[in-house]
A protein has these predicted regions:
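A short helix-coil junction within the Rossmann-fold of NAD(P)-dependent oxidoreductases
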Residues: 7-15
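Short, small-residue-biased leader/transition segments that mark boundaries at the very start
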Residues: 1-6
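Alpha-helical segment proximal to the catalytic Tyr-Lys
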Residues: 9, 53-56
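C-terminal helical subdomain
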Residues: 64-65, 85-126
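Residue(s) in the substrate-gating loop at a strand-loop-helix junction
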Residues: 24
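Conserved SDR Rossmann-fold cofactor-binding beta-strand/turn motif
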Residues: 61-71
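Active-site loop immediately N-terminal to the catalytic Tyr-X3-Lys motif
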Residues: 31-35, 90
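Active-site helix of classical SDR
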Residues: 40
Length: 126
């Protein structure tokens, strides 16, 4: 069996560890105006779940956080007015909210794997 990364061999040896991938809501809900991005995130999801199935027998948990729109460099080209409106109406999340979700995932009991955690801004429903 191939190793997915240098770290998983150490996690397998110690029979514990967590690998969390950052995916996107686009990995489970097609975004029609971003077909390449959507395809790449569907691929991430396939990688997450095949990896999880390979290493779970060794006590290594693998999951993905799938956020909706987050204030990141990907939005740097948005006009200022659009960004302000999106922030005001609650259609964007802050990076700290994604980080807190990852912390939730890795602090569950060792016999629990949060496989996928979809997080959305309050005014977004997909």
């Amino acid at each position: 069996q191939r190793q997915m990364c240098i770290r998983d061999r150490h996690m397998i040896a110690q029979r514990s560890g967590d690998i969390i991938f950052t995916s996107s809501i686009a990995g489970v809900v097609p975004v029609i105006w971003e077909p390449i991005y959507t395809a790449s995130k569907f691929a991430v999801q396939a990688f997450v779940h095949t990896t999880r199935r390979q290493v779970s027998q060794y006590g290594v948990r693998v999951g993905a956080v799938l956020p909706g729109p987050v204030v990141t460099a990907l939005l740097d080209d948005w006009p200022k007015a659009k960004m302000e409106e999106a922030l005001a109406n609650g259609s964007l999340m802050q990076p700290i909210e994604v980080a807190e979700s990852v912390l939730f995932m890795v602090t569950r009991s060792k016999n629990v794997t949060v496989r996928d955690l979809v997080i959305l801004p309050g005014s977004v429903d997909l």
